[in-house]
Amino acid sequence: MSWYKKAKGDDPEYQKMKDWFTKRTDRHINSVQKYCKKLEDYDSKRFKGLIERGEEHDQSKFKDPEIDPYIYVTWSYKCKDDGVDWEPPKGMDDKMNEATTYHVLNNSHHPEFHAGEDSEVINEEDRDDPKRDKIIDGTKMPDIDIAEMVADWVSVGNERGNSAKGWADKNINARWKFTKAQENLIYELIEVCEGS
């Protein structure tokens, strides 16, 4: 174990952040699994295997190179939600952006995975704001990836007190480009998840 990891492991503040990350991420994954099941039950032929995919959802966040930066990403959201003024350590912002880029490029439930691009895939100033000067091409996403993406959006929306429909309205054809058929599918699946 490197001295850096040992020092962080001994830091009670870091341990508190790590515990929150684990609790929040596990809760998110469980929510995604619930919606993956709901969507596979809705159309078991079209979304066969979605339940199993839900079981693997975001597991990469618990491994290098994602885990450490995502502990800070998650803590940053918690502080923002709690109205706490908090800044990550110097140099961590870049690592947080790199980890997010790595995550979206290596997990097929993100449109960026399918776009064939490896730079400028997130807005480094505000990861939740669409990057207006560059739209990511999500038109190659298969339906099962779209279904997992919707399960993810609904879960995050529930966590943040927002709706996946609002997120879709804000981001479709602003952050991510989809075909009309994909767009219709996204809204249909959001309705399946949020409508009942």
Model segments located where?
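Metal-dependent phosphohydrolase cores
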Residues: 1-196
